[in-house]
From Swiss-Prot:
GO CC terms in record: nucleus
MF terms (GO), sorted A to Z: DNA-binding transcription factor activity, RNA polymerase II-specific; RNA polymerase II transcription regulatory region sequence-specific DNA binding; zinc ion binding
Ranges where the record places region Disordered: 49-69, 131-155
Record-given protein name: Zinc finger protein 69 homolog
Keywords, ordered alphabetically: DNA-binding, Lipid metabolism, Metal-binding, Nucleus, Repeat, Transcription, Transcription regulation, Zinc, Zinc-finger
Primary location: nucleus
Zinc finger (C2H2-type): 269-291, 297-319, 325-347, 353-375, 381-403, 409-431, 437-459, 465-487, 493-515
One Pfam family cited in the UniProt record for this chain: KRAB
Matches recorded under SUPFAM superfamilies: beta-beta-alpha zinc fingers (SSF57667), KRAB domain (Kruppel-associated box) (SSF109640), Retrovirus capsid dimerization domain-like (SSF47353)
A Gene Ontology BP annotation from the UniProt entry: regulation of lipid metabolic process
Known function: Putative transcription factor that appears to regulate lipid metabolism.
Biased amino acid composition, Basic and acidic residues: 131-152
Length: 524
Protein backbone atom coordinates (compact mmCIF):
# COMPACT_ATOMS: atom_id res chain seq x y z
CA UNK A 1 0.00 0.00 0.00
CA UNK A 2 2.86 2.39 0.84
CA UNK A 3 4.50 1.76 -2.52
CA UNK A 4 1.22 2.53 -4.29
CA UNK A 5 1.00 5.86 -2.46
CA UNK A 6 4.55 6.73 -3.48
CA UNK A 7 3.90 5.80 -7.13
CA UNK A 8 1.01 8.30 -7.31
CA UNK A 9 3.35 11.12 -6.25
CA UNK A 10 5.75 13.06 -8.48
CA UNK A 11 9.40 12.16 -8.02
CA UNK A 12 10.18 15.28 -5.92
CA UNK A 13 7.21 14.81 -3.59
CA UNK A 14 7.92 11.08 -3.31
CA UNK A 15 11.48 11.89 -2.25
CA UNK A 16 10.12 14.29 0.41
CA UNK A 17 7.93 11.53 1.85
CA UNK A 18 10.76 8.96 1.82
CA UNK A 19 12.97 11.31 3.85
CA UNK A 20 10.45 11.02 6.69
CA UNK A 21 11.12 7.22 6.79
CA UNK A 22 7.53 5.87 6.95
CA UNK A 23 7.61 2.13 7.61
CA UNK A 24 4.07 1.38 6.43
CA UNK A 25 0.99 2.90 4.87
CA UNK A 26 -0.43 3.82 8.27
CA UNK A 27 2.56 6.06 8.96
CA UNK A 28 2.71 7.28 5.36
CA UNK A 29 -0.93 8.42 5.20
CA UNK A 30 -0.44 11.59 7.33
CA UNK A 31 2.56 12.51 5.18
CA UNK A 32 0.39 12.11 2.09
CA UNK A 33 -2.15 14.54 3.60
CA UNK A 34 0.62 17.04 4.43
CA UNK A 35 2.16 17.01 0.98
CA UNK A 36 -1.31 17.26 -0.63
CA UNK A 37 -2.21 20.32 1.46
CA UNK A 38 1.23 21.81 0.89
CA UNK A 39 1.11 21.66 -2.85
CA UNK A 40 -2.60 21.82 -3.66
CA UNK A 41 -3.19 24.32 -6.43
CA UNK A 42 -1.26 22.48 -9.10
CA UNK A 43 2.33 23.52 -8.37
CA UNK A 44 3.66 19.99 -8.00
CA UNK A 45 0.87 17.47 -7.88
CA UNK A 46 0.26 16.79 -11.53
CA UNK A 47 -3.22 15.80 -12.60
CA UNK A 48 -1.66 12.92 -14.46
CA UNK A 49 0.78 10.97 -12.28
CA UNK A 50 1.88 8.84 -15.19
CA UNK A 51 3.15 11.89 -17.09
CA UNK A 52 5.12 12.98 -14.03
CA UNK A 53 6.55 9.51 -13.65
CA UNK A 54 7.62 9.50 -17.30
CA UNK A 55 9.68 12.67 -17.22
CA UNK A 56 13.41 12.30 -17.26
CA UNK A 57 14.84 13.06 -13.82
CA UNK A 58 18.28 13.60 -15.24
CA UNK A 59 17.06 16.30 -17.62
CA UNK A 60 15.11 17.99 -14.84
CA UNK A 61 18.11 18.21 -12.54
CA UNK A 62 20.47 19.67 -15.15
CA UNK A 63 21.18 23.34 -14.18
CA UNK A 64 19.83 25.94 -16.53
CA UNK A 65 17.16 23.75 -18.13
CA UNK A 66 13.72 25.35 -17.74
CA UNK A 67 10.61 23.26 -17.22
CA UNK A 68 7.29 23.65 -18.95
CA UNK A 69 5.83 25.40 -15.89
CA UNK A 70 8.91 27.56 -15.31
CA UNK A 71 9.53 25.61 -12.10
CA UNK A 72 13.11 25.24 -10.94
CA UNK A 73 14.13 21.83 -9.57
CA UNK A 74 16.62 21.17 -6.79
CA UNK A 75 20.29 21.61 -7.75
CA UNK A 76 23.50 21.44 -5.74
CA UNK A 77 23.61 25.24 -5.76
CA UNK A 78 20.40 25.31 -3.71
CA UNK A 79 21.94 23.35 -0.83
CA UNK A 80 25.48 24.72 -0.95
CA UNK A 81 27.14 27.64 0.84
CA UNK A 82 29.95 29.66 -0.73
CA UNK A 83 32.67 31.74 0.93
CA UNK A 84 34.92 34.52 -0.32
CA UNK A 85 38.63 34.32 0.45
CA UNK A 86 38.20 36.77 3.33
CA UNK A 87 35.27 34.83 4.80
CA UNK A 88 37.12 31.52 4.44
CA UNK A 89 40.11 32.98 6.28
CA UNK A 90 37.91 33.88 9.26
CA UNK A 91 36.73 30.29 9.74
CA UNK A 92 38.39 28.23 12.45
CA UNK A 93 40.07 24.95 11.33
CA UNK A 94 37.33 22.93 13.02
CA UNK A 95 34.65 24.86 11.13
CA UNK A 96 36.50 24.39 7.83
CA UNK A 97 36.63 20.64 8.38
CA UNK A 98 32.95 20.64 9.29
CA UNK A 99 32.09 22.64 6.14
CA UNK A 100 34.10 20.21 3.99
CA UNK A 101 32.39 17.20 5.56
CA UNK A 102 28.85 18.61 5.25
CA UNK A 103 29.30 19.78 1.65
CA UNK A 104 30.63 16.39 0.51
CA UNK A 105 27.82 14.61 2.30
CA UNK A 106 25.20 16.97 0.81
CA UNK A 107 26.50 16.27 -2.68
CA UNK A 108 26.41 12.53 -2.00
CA UNK A 109 22.84 12.79 -0.71
CA UNK A 110 21.76 14.76 -3.78
CA UNK A 111 23.25 12.16 -6.11
CA UNK A 112 21.54 9.44 -4.06
CA UNK A 113 18.14 11.17 -4.25
CA UNK A 114 18.44 11.96 -7.95
CA UNK A 115 19.30 8.36 -8.79
CA UNK A 116 21.73 9.42 -11.50
CA UNK A 117 25.19 10.93 -11.86
CA UNK A 118 25.20 14.75 -11.77
CA UNK A 119 27.92 16.94 -13.17
CA UNK A 120 30.40 17.47 -10.33
CA UNK A 121 30.56 21.13 -9.16
CA UNK A 122 33.97 22.77 -8.97
CA UNK A 123 33.67 23.27 -5.21
CA UNK A 124 33.31 19.49 -4.72
CA UNK A 125 36.39 18.85 -6.84
CA UNK A 126 38.33 21.37 -4.76
CA UNK A 127 37.19 19.79 -1.50
CA UNK A 128 38.09 16.29 -2.67
CA UNK A 129 41.58 17.49 -3.61
CA UNK A 130 42.01 19.25 -0.26
CA UNK A 131 42.08 22.70 -1.87
CA UNK A 132 40.52 25.78 -0.34
CA UNK A 133 37.03 26.17 -1.81
CA UNK A 134 36.65 29.95 -1.62
CA UNK A 135 35.46 31.94 -4.62
CA UNK A 136 36.54 35.36 -5.91
CA UNK A 137 34.43 38.46 -5.35
CA UNK A 138 33.46 38.57 -9.04
CA UNK A 139 32.03 35.10 -8.93
CA UNK A 140 28.52 34.58 -7.69
CA UNK A 141 27.48 31.60 -5.59
CA UNK A 142 26.68 28.60 -7.73
CA UNK A 143 26.34 28.43 -11.49
CA UNK A 144 26.64 31.86 -13.28
CA UNK A 145 23.99 30.62 -15.74
CA UNK A 146 21.42 30.05 -12.98
CA UNK A 147 17.80 31.00 -13.51
CA UNK A 148 17.93 34.07 -11.25
CA UNK A 149 15.63 36.02 -13.54
CA UNK A 150 12.99 33.32 -13.47
CA UNK A 151 13.21 33.20 -9.67
CA UNK A 152 12.40 36.92 -9.35
CA UNK A 153 9.38 36.48 -11.60
CA UNK A 154 8.07 33.40 -9.85
CA UNK A 155 4.40 33.09 -8.97
CA UNK A 156 2.80 31.89 -5.74
CA UNK A 157 2.99 28.31 -7.04
CA UNK A 158 6.73 28.70 -7.57
CA UNK A 159 7.00 29.91 -3.99
CA UNK A 160 5.35 26.66 -2.85
CA UNK A 161 7.82 24.70 -4.92
CA UNK A 162 10.74 26.52 -3.35
CA UNK A 163 9.29 25.50 -0.01
CA UNK A 164 9.65 21.88 -1.12
CA UNK A 165 13.27 22.50 -2.07
CA UNK A 166 13.97 23.88 1.40
CA UNK A 167 12.06 20.99 2.94
CA UNK A 168 14.13 18.46 0.96
CA UNK A 169 17.36 20.21 1.96
CA UNK A 170 16.19 20.30 5.57
CA UNK A 171 15.39 16.59 5.45
CA UNK A 172 18.80 15.58 4.07
CA UNK A 173 20.56 17.67 6.71
CA UNK A 174 18.27 16.23 9.40
CA UNK A 175 19.45 12.70 8.59
CA UNK A 176 22.99 13.78 9.33
CA UNK A 177 22.08 15.38 12.66
CA UNK A 178 20.02 12.43 13.86
CA UNK A 179 22.89 10.11 12.97
CA UNK A 180 25.83 12.10 14.36
CA UNK A 181 24.18 14.11 17.14
CA UNK A 182 26.80 16.86 16.86
CA UNK A 183 25.84 20.26 18.19
CA UNK A 184 28.11 22.25 15.89
CA UNK A 185 26.57 20.58 12.86
CA UNK A 186 23.19 21.71 14.15
CA UNK A 187 24.35 25.29 14.56
CA UNK A 188 25.96 25.27 11.12
CA UNK A 189 22.74 24.02 9.57
CA UNK A 190 20.69 26.70 11.37
CA UNK A 191 23.05 29.44 10.18
CA UNK A 192 23.02 28.18 6.56
CA UNK A 193 19.26 27.68 6.61
CA UNK A 194 18.74 31.22 7.90
CA UNK A 195 20.97 32.64 5.14
CA UNK A 196 18.87 30.81 2.57
CA UNK A 197 15.73 32.39 4.04
CA UNK A 198 17.25 35.87 3.81
CA UNK A 199 18.06 35.30 0.13
CA UNK A 200 14.55 33.99 -0.36
CA UNK A 201 13.07 37.14 1.20
CA UNK A 202 15.02 39.32 -1.23
CA UNK A 203 13.71 37.29 -4.17
CA UNK A 204 10.05 36.97 -3.27
CA UNK A 205 9.16 39.76 -0.89
CA UNK A 206 7.56 39.82 2.52
CA UNK A 207 4.39 37.93 1.60
CA UNK A 208 6.31 34.86 0.43
CA UNK A 209 8.63 35.21 3.44
CA UNK A 210 5.59 34.91 5.72
CA UNK A 211 4.45 31.80 3.82
CA UNK A 212 7.87 30.17 4.20
CA UNK A 213 8.09 31.01 7.90
CA UNK A 214 4.64 29.49 8.49
CA UNK A 215 5.60 26.35 6.60
CA UNK A 216 8.99 26.17 8.26
CA UNK A 217 7.39 26.27 11.71
CA UNK A 218 5.21 23.30 10.76
CA UNK A 219 8.27 21.56 9.34
CA UNK A 220 10.15 22.06 12.60
CA UNK A 221 7.27 20.50 14.53
CA UNK A 222 7.30 17.51 12.15
CA UNK A 223 10.98 16.70 12.46
CA UNK A 224 12.46 15.47 15.69
CA UNK A 225 16.11 15.68 16.59
CA UNK A 226 15.84 12.69 18.91
CA UNK A 227 16.11 12.57 22.69
CA UNK A 228 19.15 14.79 22.97
CA UNK A 229 18.01 17.78 20.81
CA UNK A 230 14.52 19.00 21.68
CA UNK A 231 12.87 21.55 19.37
CA UNK A 232 16.10 23.53 19.11
CA UNK A 233 15.37 25.16 15.76
CA UNK A 234 11.90 26.28 16.87
CA UNK A 235 13.50 28.15 19.79
CA UNK A 236 16.16 29.68 17.56
CA UNK A 237 13.72 30.73 14.86
CA UNK A 238 11.33 32.28 17.38
CA UNK A 239 14.26 34.32 18.68
CA UNK A 240 15.38 35.29 15.17
CA UNK A 241 11.87 36.28 14.09
CA UNK A 242 11.95 39.08 16.68
CA UNK A 243 14.95 40.64 14.92
CA UNK A 244 13.37 42.94 12.33
CA UNK A 245 16.35 44.97 11.13
CA UNK A 246 19.53 43.49 9.57
CA UNK A 247 21.60 44.85 12.47
CA UNK A 248 19.38 43.16 15.08
CA UNK A 249 19.27 40.00 12.98
CA UNK A 250 23.05 39.73 12.78
CA UNK A 251 23.27 40.21 16.55
CA UNK A 252 20.70 37.48 17.15
CA UNK A 253 22.55 35.10 14.83
CA UNK A 254 25.78 35.89 16.67
CA UNK A 255 24.08 35.12 20.00
CA UNK A 256 22.93 31.76 18.68
CA UNK A 257 26.43 30.77 17.56
CA UNK A 258 28.27 32.15 20.61
CA UNK A 259 25.81 30.86 23.21
CA UNK A 260 24.53 27.56 21.86
CA UNK A 261 23.58 26.17 25.26
CA UNK A 262 20.93 28.89 25.64
CA UNK A 263 19.05 27.49 22.65
CA UNK A 264 19.91 23.81 22.27
CA UNK A 265 19.89 21.23 25.03
CA UNK A 266 22.35 18.55 23.99
CA UNK A 267 24.03 15.85 26.08
CA UNK A 268 26.93 14.49 24.10
CA UNK A 269 29.41 13.25 26.71
CA UNK A 270 28.49 9.90 28.23
CA UNK A 271 30.01 7.98 31.14
CA UNK A 272 31.06 4.52 29.95
CA UNK A 273 30.43 3.06 33.43
CA UNK A 274 26.92 4.24 34.33
CA UNK A 275 25.92 5.75 30.94
CA UNK A 276 25.00 9.10 32.47
CA UNK A 277 25.26 11.90 29.90
CA UNK A 278 26.59 15.46 30.27
CA UNK A 279 26.56 18.64 28.22
CA UNK A 280 30.21 19.53 28.76
CA UNK A 281 33.35 17.37 29.01
CA UNK A 282 34.43 19.01 32.29
CA UNK A 283 31.24 17.74 33.92
CA UNK A 284 32.00 14.22 32.71
CA UNK A 285 35.53 14.51 34.14
CA UNK A 286 34.14 15.55 37.52
CA UNK A 287 31.58 12.75 37.41
CA UNK A 288 34.23 10.09 36.70
CA UNK A 289 35.83 10.88 40.06
CA UNK A 290 32.76 9.33 41.71
CA UNK A 291 33.75 5.99 40.20
CA UNK A 292 37.51 6.37 40.68
CA UNK A 293 37.31 7.91 44.17
CA UNK A 294 39.82 10.58 43.16
CA UNK A 295 39.80 13.73 45.32
CA UNK A 296 42.44 16.09 43.94
CA UNK A 297 41.28 19.25 45.76
CA UNK A 298 42.58 19.39 49.34
CA UNK A 299 41.89 21.97 52.04
CA UNK A 300 45.10 23.52 53.39
CA UNK A 301 43.50 24.22 56.77
CA UNK A 302 42.20 20.79 57.77
CA UNK A 303 43.47 18.48 55.02
CA UNK A 304 40.02 17.38 53.89
CA UNK A 305 39.90 16.39 50.22
CA UNK A 306 37.17 16.92 47.61
CA UNK A 307 36.46 15.65 44.13
CA UNK A 308 35.31 19.04 42.81
CA UNK A 309 36.86 22.48 43.05
CA UNK A 310 33.47 24.04 43.83
CA UNK A 311 33.07 21.74 46.84
CA UNK A 312 36.44 22.87 48.20
CA UNK A 313 35.49 26.52 47.73
CA UNK A 314 32.26 25.97 49.65
CA UNK A 315 34.10 24.06 52.40
CA UNK A 316 36.67 26.82 52.88
CA UNK A 317 33.88 29.16 53.98
CA UNK A 318 33.75 27.13 57.21
CA UNK A 319 37.29 28.30 58.02
CA UNK A 320 36.91 31.87 56.74
CA UNK A 321 33.43 32.37 58.18
CA UNK A 322 32.24 33.77 54.86
CA UNK A 323 28.48 33.66 54.30
CA UNK A 324 27.83 35.28 50.93
CA UNK A 325 24.15 34.37 50.59
CA UNK A 326 21.97 36.74 52.62
CA UNK A 327 18.21 36.67 53.13
CA UNK A 328 16.58 39.93 52.06
CA UNK A 329 13.74 39.40 54.52
CA UNK A 330 15.61 38.98 57.80
CA UNK A 331 19.27 39.52 56.91
CA UNK A 332 20.36 36.02 57.91
CA UNK A 333 23.38 34.81 55.92
CA UNK A 334 24.32 31.35 54.68
CA UNK A 335 27.33 29.60 53.22
CA UNK A 336 25.35 27.74 50.55
CA UNK A 337 22.78 29.01 48.09
CA UNK A 338 20.72 25.88 48.68
CA UNK A 339 20.56 26.75 52.40
CA UNK A 340 19.25 30.20 51.51
CA UNK A 341 16.59 28.69 49.24
CA UNK A 342 15.48 26.40 52.06
CA UNK A 343 15.47 29.31 54.50
CA UNK A 344 13.19 31.34 52.20
CA UNK A 345 10.49 28.76 52.82
CA UNK A 346 10.35 29.78 56.48
CA UNK A 347 9.11 33.19 55.31
CA UNK A 348 6.81 31.96 52.55
CA UNK A 349 5.50 29.00 54.54
CA UNK A 350 5.98 26.78 51.52
CA UNK A 351 6.16 23.06 52.31
CA UNK A 352 6.39 21.23 48.98
CA UNK A 353 7.42 17.84 50.37
CA UNK A 354 4.43 15.81 51.60
CA UNK A 355 4.38 12.40 53.30
CA UNK A 356 2.01 10.12 51.38
CA UNK A 357 1.29 8.11 54.54
CA UNK A 358 0.19 10.82 57.00
CA UNK A 359 0.05 13.90 54.68
CA UNK A 360 2.49 15.80 56.88
CA UNK A 361 4.31 18.48 54.88
CA UNK A 362 7.94 19.60 55.09
CA UNK A 363 9.94 22.49 53.70
CA UNK A 364 13.01 20.33 52.97
CA UNK A 365 13.36 17.03 51.18
CA UNK A 366 15.81 15.70 53.80
CA UNK A 367 13.19 16.35 56.51
CA UNK A 368 10.69 14.22 54.61
CA UNK A 369 13.25 11.40 54.22
CA UNK A 370 13.96 11.45 57.95
CA UNK A 371 10.24 11.54 58.76
CA UNK A 372 9.52 8.51 56.57
CA UNK A 373 11.80 6.48 58.84
CA UNK A 374 9.30 6.95 61.67
CA UNK A 375 6.80 4.99 59.57
CA UNK A 376 9.22 2.35 58.36
CA UNK A 377 11.12 2.03 61.67
CA UNK A 378 14.39 2.21 59.76
CA UNK A 379 17.46 3.24 61.74
CA UNK A 380 20.31 3.08 59.26
CA UNK A 381 23.01 4.70 61.40
CA UNK A 382 24.70 2.34 63.91
CA UNK A 383 27.25 3.10 66.61
CA UNK A 384 30.33 0.88 66.20
CA UNK A 385 31.06 1.07 69.94
CA UNK A 386 27.78 -0.03 71.50
CA UNK A 387 25.62 -1.01 68.53
CA UNK A 388 22.92 1.58 69.21
CA UNK A 389 21.07 2.69 66.08
CA UNK A 390 19.69 6.08 65.03
CA UNK A 391 17.40 7.48 62.36
CA UNK A 392 19.55 10.53 61.66
CA UNK A 393 23.29 10.77 61.21
CA UNK A 394 23.50 13.88 63.41
CA UNK A 395 22.05 11.88 66.29
CA UNK A 396 24.77 9.26 65.78
CA UNK A 397 27.44 11.98 65.71
CA UNK A 398 26.14 13.39 68.99
CA UNK A 399 26.00 9.92 70.53
CA UNK A 400 29.60 9.09 69.57
CA UNK A 401 30.75 12.01 71.73
CA UNK A 402 29.58 10.02 74.77
CA UNK A 403 32.27 7.43 73.97
CA UNK A 404 34.98 9.88 72.94
CA UNK A 405 34.27 12.46 75.66
CA UNK A 406 34.42 15.23 73.07
CA UNK A 407 32.71 18.49 74.04
CA UNK A 408 33.16 20.90 71.13
CA UNK A 409 30.60 23.52 72.23
CA UNK A 410 31.98 25.98 74.80
CA UNK A 411 30.15 28.74 76.64
CA UNK A 412 31.81 32.12 76.05
CA UNK A 413 30.61 33.40 79.44
CA UNK A 414 31.92 30.68 81.76
CA UNK A 415 33.95 28.42 79.40
CA UNK A 416 31.85 25.39 80.29
CA UNK A 417 31.81 22.84 77.46
CA UNK A 418 29.06 20.62 76.11
CA UNK A 419 28.76 17.68 73.76
CA UNK A 420 25.57 18.95 72.09
CA UNK A 421 24.75 22.35 70.65
CA UNK A 422 21.28 22.16 72.22
CA UNK A 423 22.85 21.74 75.66
CA UNK A 424 24.92 24.88 75.10
CA UNK A 425 21.82 26.80 74.01
CA UNK A 426 19.97 25.74 77.15
CA UNK A 427 22.95 26.64 79.34
CA UNK A 428 23.36 30.12 77.84
CA UNK A 429 19.85 30.98 79.00
CA UNK A 430 21.20 30.80 82.56
CA UNK A 431 23.45 33.78 81.76
CA UNK A 432 20.91 35.69 79.70
CA UNK A 433 17.93 34.91 81.93
CA UNK A 434 15.86 34.01 78.89
CA UNK A 435 12.83 31.80 79.54
CA UNK A 436 11.09 31.40 76.17
CA UNK A 437 8.61 28.69 77.18
CA UNK A 438 5.63 30.11 79.08
CA UNK A 439 2.68 28.31 80.66
CA UNK A 440 -0.67 29.64 79.42
CA UNK A 441 -2.41 28.57 82.63
CA UNK A 442 -0.31 30.30 85.28
CA UNK A 443 2.20 32.36 83.29
CA UNK A 444 5.25 30.57 84.69
CA UNK A 445 8.19 30.54 82.25
CA UNK A 446 10.88 27.93 81.66
CA UNK A 447 14.22 27.69 79.90
CA UNK A 448 13.52 24.34 78.21
CA UNK A 449 10.47 22.95 76.44
CA UNK A 450 10.64 19.68 78.42
CA UNK A 451 10.32 21.63 81.67
CA UNK A 452 7.16 23.30 80.39
CA UNK A 453 5.72 19.93 79.39
CA UNK A 454 6.42 18.54 82.85
CA UNK A 455 4.89 21.62 84.49
CA UNK A 456 1.62 21.29 82.54
CA UNK A 457 0.90 18.03 84.32
CA UNK A 458 0.46 20.05 87.53
CA UNK A 459 -2.60 21.73 85.99
CA UNK A 460 -3.96 18.65 84.25
CA UNK A 461 -3.27 16.25 87.12
CA UNK A 462 -2.09 13.65 84.64
CA UNK A 463 0.50 11.19 85.88
CA UNK A 464 1.56 9.50 82.70
CA UNK A 465 4.41 7.43 84.12
CA UNK A 466 3.13 4.44 86.11
CA UNK A 467 5.23 1.69 87.68
CA UNK A 468 4.10 -1.74 86.47
CA UNK A 469 5.41 -3.36 89.65
CA UNK A 470 3.75 -1.33 92.40
CA UNK A 471 1.32 0.84 90.44
CA UNK A 472 2.73 4.11 91.70
CA UNK A 473 2.41 6.93 89.15
CA UNK A 474 4.52 10.01 88.48
CA UNK A 475 4.16 13.18 86.45
CA UNK A 476 7.78 13.32 85.32
CA UNK A 477 9.91 10.79 83.51
CA UNK A 478 12.90 11.60 85.73
CA UNK A 479 10.90 10.84 88.90
CA UNK A 480 9.70 7.58 87.41
CA UNK A 481 13.26 6.46 86.58
CA UNK A 482 14.40 7.24 90.13
CA UNK A 483 11.55 5.17 91.56
CA UNK A 484 12.43 2.15 89.41
CA UNK A 485 15.84 1.98 91.07
CA UNK A 486 14.08 0.86 94.25
CA UNK A 487 12.98 -2.27 92.43
CA UNK A 488 16.12 -2.89 90.37
CA UNK A 489 18.65 -1.94 93.07
CA UNK A 490 20.62 0.08 90.52
CA UNK A 491 23.09 2.56 92.03
CA UNK A 492 24.70 4.49 89.20
CA UNK A 493 26.27 7.27 91.32
CA UNK A 494 29.61 6.20 92.87
CA UNK A 495 31.89 8.13 95.21
CA UNK A 496 35.42 8.64 93.88
CA UNK A 497 36.84 8.80 97.42
CA UNK A 498 35.53 5.61 99.01
CA UNK A 499 33.75 3.80 96.16
CA UNK A 500 30.34 3.84 97.82
CA UNK A 501 27.42 3.86 95.35
CA UNK A 502 24.02 5.53 95.55
CA UNK A 503 20.71 5.38 93.73
CA UNK A 504 20.30 9.16 93.52
CA UNK A 505 22.64 11.97 92.60
CA UNK A 506 21.40 13.99 95.58
CA UNK A 507 22.46 11.15 97.92
CA UNK A 508 25.97 11.21 96.41
CA UNK A 509 26.13 15.00 96.90
CA UNK A 510 25.24 14.67 100.60
CA UNK A 511 27.82 11.88 100.94
CA UNK A 512 30.54 14.16 99.52
CA UNK A 513 29.85 16.58 102.36
CA UNK A 514 31.01 13.90 104.84
CA UNK A 515 34.42 13.68 103.15
CA UNK A 516 34.79 17.47 103.05
CA UNK A 517 34.02 17.75 106.78
CA UNK A 518 36.56 15.03 107.59
CA UNK A 519 39.24 16.81 105.57
CA UNK A 520 38.46 20.10 107.31
CA UNK A 521 38.64 18.52 110.79
CA UNK A 522 41.95 16.82 110.01
CA UNK A 523 43.47 20.11 108.90
CA UNK A 524 42.53 21.69 112.24
Amino acid sequence: MLQQLLITLPTEASTWVKLHHPENAKEGAPLWEDVTKMFEGGALLSQDADETQGESLKDELTPGTPTTDSQELLTFKDISVDFTQEEWGQLAPAHRNLYREVMLENYGNLVSVAGCQLSKPSVISQLEKGEEPWMTEKEGPGDPNSDLKSKTETSASNAKYNILQEQLYHGMMMERFMRDDVIYSTLKKVSEYDDELEKHQDRHGRNVRQTIMTHKKRSQETYKFGKNIVSSNVVIEQRLRKCDTPRKRNKCKSDVINHPTSYIRVKTYECNICEKAFKQPIHLTEHMRIHTGEKPFRCKECGRAFSQSASLTTHQRIHTGEKPFECEECGKAFRHRSSLNQHHRTHTGEKPYICDKCQKAFSQNISLIQHLRTHSGEKPFTCNECGKTFRQIRHLSEHIRIHTGEKPYACTACCKTFSHRAYLTHHQRIHTGERPYKCKECGKAFRQRIHLSNHKTVHTGVKAYECNRCGKAYRHDSSFKKHQRHHTGEKPYECNECGKAFSYNSSLTRHHEIHRRNVFQNNI
